[in-house]
A protein has these predicted regions:
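Extended, low-complexity, charged alpha-helical tracts
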Residues: 2-278
Length: 278
């Protein structure tokens, strides 16, 4: 796809969002329907495959974020609807759900930063949207949450956002999303904490500090949504340790030291056994 075609698609998505929001004044409601409809129309009318198809999705997300910003909407708060609408739209043309979650979550973070929006809030919303969509589409909620988490953590690093704050927000998004769809929060918390560590390792970040932030986020989120705080802390810590142990024994020990003990007033107990390097 040419650069001119990219600009046209971004402009079309932006225009559609602006008109829809002006017409109903409901940013959240307009987002899901407009982005879903735009993608169905665009993707059904193209022969694009693979990377080009992914590019079309990213351009649509970019235009949507720009549209929300233009009408004065809070881009961070709109992230959930953007991810949900994108996944509903791409479902109609058979694009893989997890691939779409990854590319969409990444595009949301990048576009949010470009318009000066709240990247941390966008990260939370992207994960929530991925979980809600996964429930609708019959995909593993834990895999969806982990995929979105990996994408937003890497995205936050790429745009220079504070990864620690993003990590905490992601865990809040996991707990709120699983509560909304009635899913097992502990599995998703553990999976997302693991994804945080893997993404942080890939970007050269501080694994011990990030692991602790993940546990702090799980604790804060558990209190907010009314689930067992100790279990949530344990799930996050165990997920982080398992992922770190897959990198190396020394990294696993480093992360374990960071998350064992009392964090945010909660005694963190690890779910044994966790994976160790031979």
């Amino acid at each position: 796809m040419s650069e001119e075609q990219n600009k046209t698609l971004i402009s079309a998505a932006k225009g559609g969002i602006v008109e829809a929001i002006k017409g109903v004044g409901d940013v959240a409601g307009a987002l899901v329907d407009v982005i879903s409809g735009t993608l169905v129309k665009t993707l059904q009318g193209t022969r694009a495959v693979g990377a080009e198809m992914t590019g079309l999705v990213k351009d649509t997300v970019t235009g949507t974020v720009q549209g929300v910003a233009e009408v004065g909407g809070e881009v961070g708060s709109a992230a959930k609807g953007i991810v949900l609408g994108t996944l509903r739209g791409t479902k109609e043309v058979g694009i893989g759900v997890l691939d779409t979650i990854s590319s969409t979550s990444s595009a949301v973070i990048k576009s949010t930063a470009e318009v000066g929006g709240d990247v941390v809030t966008s990260a939370k919303g992207a994960v929530e949207g991925a979980i809600v969509a996964a429930k609708e589409l019959g995909v593993s909620i834990t895999e969806a949450a982990s995929t979105a988490t990996n994408a937003v953590i890497k995205g936050a690093h790429a745009v220079g956002s504070e990864v620690g704050h993003t990590t905490k927000a992601v865990l809040v998004g996991v707990c709120q999303g699983t509560k909304e769809v009635g899913a097992n929060a502990m599995e998703a918390i553990s999976g997302s904490a693991s994804a945080v560590i893997k993404a942080t390792a890939d970007t050269g970040g501080d694994l011990a500090s990030t692991a602790k932030k993940a546990v702090e986020g799980a604790i804060a989120a558990a209190k907010e949504v009314g689930i067992d705080v100790t279990e949530a802390a344990s799930a996050a810590a165990t997920g982080a340790i398992n992922a770190a142990g897959e990198i190396s024994a020394s990294v696993g020990a480093q992360v374990r030291d960071a998350v064992v003990g009392t964090i945010s007033g909660v005694k963190v107990v690890i779910q044994e056994p966790f994976k160790k390097e031979p």
